[in-house]
Amino acid sequence: MRPPALLALFSCSAAFALMSEEIKEKVTPSQDLRQSSLPGRHDIDLKEIVFVIQSQSNSFHAKRAEQLKKNILKQAANLTQDLPRVLLLHQLAKQEGAWTILPLLPHFSVTYSKNSAWIFFCEEETRLQIPRLLDTLRRYDPSKEWFLGKALYDEESTIIHHYAFSENPTVFKYPDFAAGWALSIPLVNKLAKRLKSEALKSDFTIDLKHEIALYIWDKGGGPALTPVPEFCTEDVDPRCVTTFHSFLPLCGVPVKKEEIFVAVKTCKKFHADRIPIVKKTWAAQASLIEYYSDYAETAIPTVDLGIPNTDRGHCGKTFAILEKFLNHSHNKISWLVIVDDDTLISISRLRHLLSCYDSSDPVFLGERYGYGLGTGGYSYVTGGGGMVFSREAIRRLLVSSCRCYSNDAPDDMVLGMCFSGLGVPVTHSPLFHQARPVDYPKDYLAHQIPVSFHKHWHIDPVKVYLTWLAPSEEDQATQETQKDPREEL
């Protein structure tokens, strides 16, 4: 049975390009935003909400965020002359870790605490009904500490959350960013004070929404997430003030298979059990694919790069792949994808996704993690879900002096450090996954059209591929019906 997001692809993909039309709110100018006489309602103005769009600097994502900003302000202008502030996250600070939000809370506290009641966060594809949002926030006393959102929870303990709450993982709730989430100013002030007195302790940022919820909860010293039923990802209830439709971006014609080179990292001990899974599932979708190993086996065939296998890291092997691609492949091959031999990926969906990016730009794309972002550090694309490079990104990397400090260094982290030093940002896509489908909440995956998953551990990888990633009629319908979202920007 197909996941809900796949079943909705035909209708939702078309909706992706029509966001500005669908978001329009039917309101009358006579609606009074300054009065709230109902019992239990709190008198706040629209101008007391600071909107923060969790945007990215890549041109495609920045334009989508700018479009949402214009829509929010347009809705607001229909209601009041005192417009709210709408901020784009990637413009707020030059620091690498701005996307993790917590380092920005002291700035929010100093800048907005006197004249604001709420900081409302959302993603670039979140759709907002501004009058209803204001009405919803008026239910909560802005003088108290509130952490509001659509609640997600783990059905079983998972590695991406360090097996937190292993006895009963369902007890801890964290927000689905796609539905929007909000912090009251008193809570922002409290968190800002704490951040000034004690540094962020975690070295790694893996799942930001879970980690923010943990930090706010503070082992019971702070508020837990308050679920808000009006914060939605699917438009299933007339009360919804936010929605987030499933989408697989398509900006014109999908990238040709011949423009994508796929490099599979493997080693001799996995030739017999992992490579057959690759060939049985997604390999046929790739026009250009090679298997890079520590041992040349003609039956597969594998390519021996002359780099000894290591139990961890694989940095030497990855840089050898990058150099081989840049120096020995045709210039018309615009994209390199590096995956593990236990990565499950949809090349057809990747072709759709890459149509939204300019291969002449330095693009480094995948699921974004962070290391040491509270104290400098850098972002990186986690390798298991697949790392996507434009040719230009690889060229800039290899003309620099940044290289592995050892063959067994963690390749994805070294790449992140190198690209950070070069000023090439990681472009995040939540459609890539470092873990298995069972490691994510069902509600979270329900509004995705996934591109990849990772690991064969305790699953049937062929079944997972057929359920979540195999080409389908819905994917073909996307090509036939979806408009180029860039046309409206």
From Swiss-Prot:
Q: Care to name a GO molecular-function term for this sequence?
A: glycosyltransferase activity
Establish whether keyword Nucleotidyltransferase is in the entry. Answer: no
Enumerate the PROSITE patterns for this protein: ER_TARGET (PS00014)
User: Among its keywords, does the record have Amino-acid biosynthesis?
Assistant: no
Subcellular location, record wording: Endoplasmic reticulum membrane
Using the UniProt annotation, give the residues that carry a glycan (glycosylation sites): N78
Q: Which residues cross the membrane?
A: 2-22
Gene Ontology BP annotations: brain development; camera-type eye development; cilium assembly; cilium organization; cranial skeletal system development; fucose metabolic process; gene expression; limb development
- Quote the Pfam families the UniProt record gives: Fringe
Role, per record: O-glucosyltransferase that transfers glucose toward fucose with a beta-1,3 linkage. Specifically glucosylates O-linked fucosylglycan on TSP type-1 domains of proteins, thereby contributing to elongation of O-fucosylglycan.
Protein name according to UniProt? Beta-1,3-glucosyltransferase
Q: Which organism is it from?
A: Mus musculus (Mouse)
Q: Which gene encodes it?
A: B3glct
